[in-house]
Amino acid sequence: FIWKKHRFSIFLPGQHQISNAVTALAAAEELMERLPSEGRRKLEPGENARFIPAADKRLGWPEMERGLANARWPGRLELLGERPYTFRDGAHNPDGARKLAQFLEKHFTNRRIIYIMGVLKDKEYEKMLAELMPLASEIYTFRPHNERGLSGEVLAACAQRFGVPSHCCQDVNEAIRRGREKAEQEDVIVICGSLSFMEEMED
């Protein structure tokens, strides 16, 4: 994308990441304008720029371009594998679920979407399901290992009200295994609902 006549590349999937990137660029530009043109200070004899704190280095358009190009965000539309495509996304509110659904609808039209989902009981999970279930072929639910985790049975029952075949599992790894067993190579598996269970996932 182009912002203020500068071309930027980002590798974070999802149209909303462009808006996030523009916000970050605006903040960086404000910081850049506050710094002297030569940077915070010049190098002393014998100093190596690699060991100077980031705030003491010059910030400019090349640094901003490299920063965005190198940005990665684990757990946000993170591609874990292909054939079938497998994504991990920490969307845990209706807005995040809506952005996830928009991404899937744009890039995976006419493909079967299999959700692996666990949520916390204090989240608006019914509204999240309302965003996600119109695209769903199946859903495998589980309770995250968290005292606030919602029962997988409750989540499955809610999903069934949208007419989606729902299966309750013991944990995220069982849900992933069963989802993969059911998926064809052209399907899409989406692991979502919370960031809290990411560390529970086996490699």
List PLM regions with ranges.
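C-terminal helical cap/extension that packs against the catalytic core
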Residues: G39, Y85-F87, P94, L129-V188
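Short glycine-/acidic-enriched loop or helix-start segments at secondary-structure transitions
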Residues: A97-R98, Y125-K127, S151-G152, E200-D203
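Active-site-proximal loop/hinge segments that shape catalytic or ion-binding/gating pockets
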Residues: S194
